[in-house]
């Protein structure tokens, strides 16, 4: 954890802080370093919509070492080959978009953990401190990190949420309000009463499951977030 600030992020959550982050879509890692210096608790490095390759992803993650900001990386999908490319870079969290059902959730969780908890391939690189960390310590850490963050951003996923939340190993649910509104035929209208009702349902069920709750937010959404006990 000393290489990705995960413990610092989790301690802030436990202390009741609403952690804030910055979404990174540009290739220059200086942008990520600037975000950390600006005081953000985490950076969401976007491999789904951003123009980033694996080498660039590594540079963004390294840019946060020595800061107080945790690197989260959003992969393009729950495909284990996509997750494998990033997880060896030792980000604090893996964000998996468009999780639709319990099968997607289980697939993502297993891709992030070694056997017997999952099916991650054994690639000891940065998380193993390039061979300087005792193997026992590394494997113990690998059972807890990175955070496995699943995005609920489609009405189909909401309908399947009860089953999704029953999958062992999920660390956090992150709400995607804009994609959710699109899937409801209300594109961009996150404040519509029907969308708000669905967002509230996701919040309540996630909190009741004892799972960390995050959300994408712009200025207007931030007021809604504070009222729903969203943690980051």
Question: Where do the model's predicted regions map?
Answer:
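Expand to "…catalyze enediolate/carbanion chemistry for C-C bond making/breaking, isomerization
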Residues: 1-232
